[in-house]
């Protein structure tokens, strides 16, 4: 009887994987699926499979060897591999993809969710975005930078099945590790309102030094000169900002660097889904950026 239960479970698991693969393929091909319909399908699948899962689950036997638990881990690895393939295909399906994305939290009445922001960062990594800036005007994420990094690494392992210890990390554009976190193949910078102001102050100081050294004249200060001083750290300006919350403002997020940035507003970052995230990417890919013209 146990063998029959296991066979039924394997068949249902295979059907579920096939359903997800077909859904991903159709969404990439047509791009018009309603994400609410997907949520309903997932909820229905969970409702159907949950009782069976409880039926098939066996109580752990005392002294049983750990090798009997390899099947769930194998299933997790398969799911992670499926996620990687699906999300990478999503990124390649877009006409254009932001190189640098900003995540700006403007919600003031709710505590920010580290797990939801970590999910967004991992999704960015999966679709191929290279730089992420995480910002909240209260500086909560920056004060708890280590906690955010731990959550990102945890989500990376769970969603993508990647072990960050296998990669050689490099911190983006700073010598201060306390100001930044790094995810494999993705530079993540955690910012607060002081960072944007500090960048402008440093750029002004650098220009004054150039004038004092007679390498520049005071009249040489213009938009292009200031832009070059601010971008000298090697990180490109944000191409896209996802602003979460009802406030119609970025609340001091890199004021100079977002002159030409596309901004997409979302109601909240809490419980955000991958479909919401990818919908914002599709909106960015479809927009025509005039670059100030």
Swiss-Prot record:
A GO MF label: ditrans,polycis-polyprenyl diphosphate synthase [(2E,6E)-farnesyl diphosphate specific] activity
Annotated phenotype, changing residue 100 to A: 3.5-fold reduction in catalytic activity and no marked change in affinity for FPP and IPP
PANTHER family: DEHYDRODOLICHYL DIPHOSPHATE SYNTHASE COMPLEX SUBUNIT NUS1
Gene name as annotated: NUS1
Protein name: Dehydrodolichyl diphosphate synthase complex subunit NUS1
Family: Belongs to the UPP synthase family.
Spans traversing the lipid bilayer: 1-23, 35-56, 117-135
Activity modulation notes: Activated by phospholipids including cardiolipin, phosphatidylcholine, phosphatidylethanolamine, phosphatidylinositol and phosphatidylserine.
Localization (cell): Endoplasmic reticulum membrane
Locus of motif RXG motif: 290-292
UniProt-annotated glycosylation sites, renumbered to this chain: 144, 271
Enzyme Commission code: 2.5.1.87
Effect of residue 253 to A: Disrupts NUS1-DHDDS heterodimerization
Native species: Homo sapiens
């Amino acid at each position: 009887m146990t063998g029959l239960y296991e066979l039924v479970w394997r068949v249902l698991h295979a059907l579920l994987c096939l359903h997800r693969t077909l859904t991903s393929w159709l969404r990439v091909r047509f791009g018009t699926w309603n994400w609410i319909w997907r949520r309903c399908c997932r909820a229905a699948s969970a409702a159907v499979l949950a009782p069976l899962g409880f039926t098939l689950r066996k109580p752990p036997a005392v002294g049983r060897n750990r090798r009997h638990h390899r099947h769930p881990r194998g299933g997790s690895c398969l799911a992670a591999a499926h996620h990687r393939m699906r999300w990478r295909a999503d990124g390649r399906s877009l006409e254009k993809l932001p190189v640098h994305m900003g995540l700006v939290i403007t919600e003031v009445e709710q505590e920010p969710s580290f797990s939801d922001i970590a999910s967004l960062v991992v999704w960015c990594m999966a679709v191929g975005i290279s730089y992420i800036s995480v910002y909240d005007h209260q500086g909560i994420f920056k004060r708890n930078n280590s906690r955010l990094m731990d959550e990102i690494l945890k989500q990376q392992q769970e969603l993508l099945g990647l072990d960050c210890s296998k990669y050689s990390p490099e911190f983006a554009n700073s010598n201060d590790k306390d100001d930044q976190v790094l995810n494999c193949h993705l530079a993540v910078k955690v910012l607060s309102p002081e960072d944007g102001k500090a960048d402008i102050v440093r750029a002004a100081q650098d220009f004054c030094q150039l004038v004092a050294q007679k390498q520049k004249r005071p009249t040489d200060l213009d938009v292009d000169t200031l832009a070059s001083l601010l971008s000298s750290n090697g990180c490109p300006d944000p191409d896209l900002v996802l602003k979460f919350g009802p406030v119609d403002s970025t609340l001091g997020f890199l004021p100079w660097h977002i002159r030409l940035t596309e901004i997409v507003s979302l109601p909240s970052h809490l419980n955000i889904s991958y479909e919401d995230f990818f919908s914002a990417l599709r909106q960015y890919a479809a927009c025509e950026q005039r670059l100030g013209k």
